[in-house]
């Protein structure tokens, strides 16, 4: 059985990472490494993949550099509408929320919903009420954030634990300046997030097109080598006129990060002692 491992992404962008000042890129790499380390700590202790992906994503949600949780971008009306999803590969249990603004860590809300059972997908104040009632922590709204303050995207994490179980988590503030009420692919199981017994996937990019192409599910179902499957289905997004990226991991331990039309922030760790992080094409990639 392959050793435990974690793979995360901090969003795909056409130009943000390559044009960002050095201090921003350094901070981003530091944040990615911290998220990877948080997930790795869970796996080292023998914890489940679900706990590992939630721990990793919560670090990114707490980092204002990334477009999730604390760093979530605003709609065209200046409101905050956060989305997140979580899926357990071993059981096919999942939970997703969208359009929330009162949760400090939306992915923690998803975990509490997943553990509680039905419903699996909730929106807005009803999702908030459900998650807060299950013990999720509320956030303080510090007021409007300039729409141009972030250009990077969604965050996500995948993990394989010592028992061979996979999990996937995705969290986002969505598209900067989006129409209020708009929901992208991140909380849509099978489009932006997926995990089964064989594969886990988390996506980032032009959400409407990832929904149309059901990217996460198609990558998971593919019998092609993982990198080829990722390239094929990101190619479908490109054919539809969009850009984006994804991270994917199989139960055999193979993993990949891929992007079309830009760059994707990524980091990874395996119990075999392999780890790394990167933002640009010339930076390290997981293999």
Describe each model-derived feature in a short phrase:
Residues 1-287:
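Alpha/propeptide regions of enzymes that mature by internal proteolysis
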């Amino acid at each position: 059985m392959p050793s435990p491992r974690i793979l995360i992404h901090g969003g795909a962008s056409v130009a943000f990472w390559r044009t960002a000042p050095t201090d921003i890129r350094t901070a981003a790499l530091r944040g990615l490494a911290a998220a990877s380390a948080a997930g790795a700590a869970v796996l080292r202790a023998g914890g489940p993949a679900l706990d590992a992906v939630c721990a990793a994503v919560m670090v990114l949600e707490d980092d204002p550099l990334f477009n999730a949780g604390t760093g979530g971008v605003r709609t065209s009306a200046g409101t905050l509408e956060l989305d997140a999803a979580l899926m357990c590969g071993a059981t096919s249990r999942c939970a997703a929320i969208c359009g929330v603004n009162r949760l400090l860590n939306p992915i923690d809300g998803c975990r509490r919903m997943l553990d509680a059972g039905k419903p699996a997908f909730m929106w807005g104040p009803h999702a908030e009420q459900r998650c807060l009632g299950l013990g999720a922590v509320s956030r303080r709204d510090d007021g409007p954030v300039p729409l141009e303050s972030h250009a990077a995207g969604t965050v996500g994490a995948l993990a394989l634990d010592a028992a061979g179980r996979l999990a996937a988590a995705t969290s986002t503030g969505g598209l900067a300046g989006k129409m209020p009420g708009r929901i992208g692919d991140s909380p849509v199981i099978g489009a932006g997030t997926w995990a089964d017994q064989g594969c886990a996937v988390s996506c980032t990019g032009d959400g409407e097109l990832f929904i149309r192409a059901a990217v996460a599910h198609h990558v998971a179902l593919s019998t092609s080598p993982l990198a080829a499957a990722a390239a094929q289905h990101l190619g479908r997004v490109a054919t539809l006129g969009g850009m984006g990226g994804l991270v994917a991991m199989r139960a055999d331990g193979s993993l990949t990060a891929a992007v079309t039309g830009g760059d994707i922030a990524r980091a990874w760790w395996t119990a075999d002692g392999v780890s790394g992080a990167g933002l640009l094409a010339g930076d390290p990639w997981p293999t």
